[in-house]
Amino acid sequence: QGLPSFFAYLLGALALLVAFMYCYSRLTPHHEWALIRAGNAAAATAYGGSILGFTLPLYSAMAHSISYIDFILWGVVAFGVQIATFFGLKLFLRRQGESLSQHITEGHQAYGTLVGSISIAVGLINAASMTW
């Protein structure tokens, strides 16, 4: 029972992670992979922070869920929270007259760090919320 469960959770988590990375990079207005290949540290920092911000609650869901289906459902919640975090920050900055994607595309490291840090912070809060 132990080894099959291990592989089920591992493969489920990896599938959710790959799906998150793919969807996040498709939903954001800038093109993370192209920017990262070009050496854009702001894009790498923002994208890396969002990945960590997703995997923190994914870990919590894996550790605290009562079943595999419960884990997957909480993983989907974590997915949605991270996507909403990016778009919430984007909307907030737009109201300040700034384009988040433009700053990241232009390699402004401060904005990449801001996105990455907020993504991790929200991920930690999300993970703690899953410890019921």
Q: Which residues fall in each region the model found?
A:
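Membrane-interface elements of multi-pass transporters and channels
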Residues: 26-31, 65, 91-100, 132
